[in-house]
Amino acid sequence: MADKTPGGSQKASSKNRSSDVHSSGSSDAHMDASGPSDSDMPSRTRPKSPRKHNYRNESSRESLCDSPHQNLSRPLLENKLKAFSIGKMSTAKRTLSKKEQEELKKKEDEKAAAEIYEEFLAAFEGSDGNKVKTFVRGGVVNAAKDEHETDEKRGKIYKPSSRFADQKNPPNQSSNERPPSLLVIETKKPPLKKGEKEKKKSNLELFKEELKQIQEERDERHKTKGRLSRFEPPQSDSDGQRRSMDVPSRRNRSSGVLDDYAPGSHDVGDPSTTNLYLGNINPQMNEEMLCQEFGRFGPLASVKIMWPRTDEERARERNCGFVAFMNRRDAERALKNLNGKMIMSFEMKLGWGKAVPIPPHPIYIPPSMMEHTLPPPPSGLPFNAQPRERLKNPNAPMLPPPKNKEDFEKTLSQAIVKVVIPTERNLLALIHRMIEFVVREGPMFEAMIMNREINNPMFRFLFENQTPAHVYYRWKLYSILQGDSPTKWRTEDFRMFKNGSFWRPPPLNPYLHGMSEEQETEAFVEEPSKKGALKEEQRDKLEEILRGLTPRKNDIGDAMVFCLNNAEAAEEIVDCITESLSILKTPLPKKIARLYLVSDVLYNSSAKVANASYYRKFFETKLCQIFSDLNATYRTIQGHLQSENFKQRVMTCFRAWEDWAIYPEPFLIKLQNIFLGLVNIIEEKETEDVPDDLDGAPIEEELDGAPLEDVDGIPIDATPIDDLDGVPIKSLDDDLDGVPLDATEDSKKNEPIFKVAPSKWEAVDESELEAQAVTTSKWELFDQHEESEEEENQNQEEESEDEEDTQSSKSEEHHLYSNPVREEATESKFSKYSEMSEEKRAKLREIELKVMKFQDELESGKRPKKPGQSFQEQVEHYRDKLLQREKEKELERERERDKKDKEKLESRSKDKKEKDECTPTRKERKRRHSTSPSPSRSSSGRRVKSPSPKSERSERSERSHKESSRSRSSHKDSPRDASKKAKRSPSGSRTPKRSRRSRSRSPKKSGKKSRSQSRSPHRSHKKSKKNKH
C-alpha cells in the first residue's frame, strides 16, 4: 500500500504536465506543472519521494542547462521533449483496474530504479568517465497504464543524437504525444549540496562526450572513404591515432598521400599496392632524378623523399623515400630490375610500401608513353584522319595525294581518326561545359556560340576541324548523345559518318593499364648493349682501386673480389689492368701489387663463380703486352738491388703459375723471355704475320683474281687477265702483248719467287724512268708528224719530191697511231703502262663483279642460255665484251691526253722560236739565189729548179731522215745523239714556222718553203759530218 501513492501522484503530475505543454509550450509552465504539491501526496510516501524527485530535478536541469548558451534553452527544451516523447498515451488502456495498474507499475519501477541507480553511480561517482551518459525513455520510469506491454522499445536505454540537430523545421507534435515524466522538476531543492557540485561536473563531461562522439562519427566517415580508395581493411586503432592521421588529410587533400609515408612503413602483404619503399638513397639525389630512373618502367603516381630533419637522421648520410606507380605491373618490373642496382654509388634497396591513392593523372609520364598519347601529325584529311600505315609507323613518309575522287574516297574510308584527350585543364573544362549545353539546348546553341565567340581564341576548337581539340569535342558530343557516361565510354572503333573514316576513342585511363610491350622494349633498348661492360660507377671504382692498390694482402684480396663479382665485364677489366701496367711512371710497389692482382685473379679463375673462367682467356691475349711493359720498367730501374728485387718478384709469379698449371709451359717460357728481353714482341708479331701472306697477296687484294705483281705490270688496255675466274681466256691469250707465249713462259720461270708479297713500288721506278725517256723523244716525233700532216693537206699540188717526203712522215704516223691493238704493245708503249693505278684495278674488280653477277643469273635461270654455248663460254664472251669496252674507253682517254700535251708543247715552242725565225730564212734565200744557175720561173711565176739537184736532195733527205730515226731508236741516251738533236733543232724548228707563214700567202710560196724544209735535214746532216771530221 505504501507504493501505490507515488504511482498515483506521478500519473496526476503527468496529466498536469501534458495539459500545460499543449496549452502554452513554455518551459516555465513545465516547471510549474511538473512538481506535485505536498498535499497531493500521502504522508507515508513522502520519505521516498525526495530521492526520486531529486534525480528527476537533476536530470531536468541537466537537459535545460546542457546548452553552452542560455538563449538557446527554449528551442533545445522543445527538441528534448520531442525526442523523449516516444511512448504514446492510448485511451484504450484506461479500462484497466487501479489495482492491476499499480502492481504493474511497481515491477517496472523497481527495474527502472535499479538501472537509474547504476547510471547515477557511474555518472556522479566517476566509476567510468569515458562512458556516455544515457537517458531513460519516458515510458520506462513512469509508463501509463494504457501503454502496450508488448512494445519493442520498452525497457531500452535511449542514446541521444547530435546536439546540433536540424532545428529549422521541427515537426509538429501530435495530440497523442505527451512529455515524458523524466523532465518533471520539483519545486523543492535537493538537500545534498554535494549533488549540486557533481551536477556541474556532469554538464561539462556530457558536453565533452558529445564532442567526442561527433569526432568519432567524422573519423568513421573519413576512414571509410580512405578504405575504399586504398583497398585496406578497417583499422582498429584508438581514436587519438585516427585523429592524428586524418587531421592533415582534412587540411589538404594531397597530404593524405604523404601521411602514409611514415618512417616505419613496411610491407603489409597487400597484393594490390603500387608503392615502392626505397631504403638507401644518395643524399644528393632529388625527386626529379628518381622520376628519370623509375619512370622508365611506367607512369608514376607520386614520388617522395623523406628528407632528414634531425641531426641523427643527417648523420646516417642516406635517405629513404617512396615511389608509387600507376599500376602494379610496372611497379613489379621496377622492383625486379632496380633492386640491388647501384645508383649514384648507392645500392638501391627496394620493398613494398603501404598503398597510396592513385591520382587520375600521373605526375611523370615516360617519353615512350608520351609519344603514344600525343596527337598524330597533320595529314590533310578531314578531322586529321591518318592512313593505317602511317598510324602504325609515324615516321613513314606522306603518301602522294590521290589523283581522282575514287582513290580519295577509298583512302578516307580506310583512315582512322585518333581521338586524344586535351591536356590543358581549362580547355577540357570548356569543352565539357559546351557539350553539356549543346546536348540540352540543341545545335542552335552551338551556332549562336560560334557566331558570338568567333574572335575568342578559347573557342577556336569550334572552327578548326583539324585540331585535336575539335576532334575530341566532336567525339565526346557524339558519345554523350549515344548514351555513354561522361566517365565511361566504348573504346572500339566506329564510323561516325556514312562512308567516312573510323573513329578510335581514347582509352578510359591509359596509365592504369601499364606500358605496352613495344614501349617496354623501347625503354630497355640500351640494356643489351651494356651487357658485358662495366657501368660508369663500377669503372670509376675499379680505377680508384687500381690507383690506391698496395702490396698488402687485404687490398689485393678486395680488388680480386671486385673483379670476380663483375666477371661479366672481364674483358674491360683486363684492358683496364693492362693499361695501368703500361705506365712507366707508376711506382714499383704499385706495379708489383697490380701484377699480384693479376696472379690472384688467374688463380681464382677456376673458382665456382659465374664467368670467372673468362679472365684466363682474356689475360692470355694481354700477358705478352703486360710483360713487355714490365721489361721496359725493369730496364729503367737505376739501382742494381732495386732491379734485382723487382726481377725476383716477377719471377716468383712465373714459378707460381707453373705450379698452378694455368697456362702451358711453352707459353710461360715465352712470357719469361719477353720479360728478360730475350725475345722482342714486335719481331714475334712480324714472324706470326708471315704465314698469312704466303700466297703473295692479302685476301682483300685477291678479289680481282690476279696476283699483285701481275696487276701492276700490265696496262689495262693490253691486260691478258689470265686468272680472273680460274679459266684462261682463249680468244685474248695468244699474242696480246706482242710477245710469243714461250718467251713469256720463260720470263715467268726466270722471275724470282717471293716468300713475302713484293711491294707494288718495286717495279715502278724503272718503268717510270723508261716511260719518261720515251716520252721526251716521242713528243719530237709527234711534232714532226703533225707538221708533216699539215703540209700534206696544204701542198696537194706539190711536186713528187715533196710527196715522197710527206709519205715517209705518213708511214711513220701510221706506225704510231694506226696500228691494231696487238701492235700497240711495243717496247715504249709497254714501258709507259708498266705501273697500274688503283683506279684501273678498281675497274677490273667492277668488271669481275659484273661477270660473277652475270654467271649467277645464268645459273639461276634469270638470263636465258644461248644455244650452242656452254655456261663458261657465255661468261667468257661477256667478260671479253666488258674488257673490250673498257679498252676503247681507255684508248679515247689516252688520245685526248696526248692531244692536250701536244698542244701545250706547240704553244711553248712557238714562243721560244719566233725570235730566231727571221734571220735564218734570209740566209737560206741568199744561198738559193747564189747556187741556182738559171733563174727560170715555174708555171706559177716562181723559179724552176734543175732536175738533177732536186733528185739528189730528195735522196739525201730520205737517207738523213732514216738515219735520224734509226739513231733515235737505237742510241737514246748517247751524247752524240744529244748533239745531233741540238743541231737539228734550229732547222726543225724553223720549218714549221715557215710553213705556217706560207699559209697566209699563195700555195706557190708554200711549196717553195716546203722544199727548203726537205733540204734542212740534209744540211744539218752535212754539218754534223763536218763536225765529226
UniProtKB/Swiss-Prot annotation:
Ranges of compositional bias, category Basic and acidic residues: 55-64, 97-110, 144-155, 186-222, 239-249, 810-841, 874-922, 950-980
Chief site of localization: nucleus
InterPro entries to which the protein is assigned, alphabetical: CID_dom (IPR006569), ENTH_VHS (IPR008942), mRNA_splic_Cwf21_dom (IPR013170), Nucleotide-bd_a/b_plait_sf (IPR012677), RBD_domain_sf (IPR035979), RRM_dom (IPR000504), SR-CTD_assoc_factor (IPR051485), SR140_cwf21 (IPR047488)
Record-level Gene Ontology MF annotations: RNA binding
Domain (RRM) ranges: 274-355
Glycyl lysine isopeptide (Lys-Gly) (interchain with G-Cter in SUMO2) crosslink site(s): K80, K145, K168, K208, K748, K749, K760, K829, K832
Keyword RNA-binding included in the entry's annotation: yes
UniProt cross-references to PROSITE patterns, sorted A to Z: CID, RRM, SURP
Occurrences of domain CID (ranges): 534-679
Matches recorded under PANTHER family: RNA PROCESSING PROTEIN LD23810P, U2 SNRNP-ASSOCIATED SURP MOTIF-CONTAINING PROTEIN
Binding partners and assembly: Interacts with ERBB4.
Similarity section: Belongs to the splicing factor SR family.
Protein name as annotated: U2 snRNP-associated SURP motif-containing protein
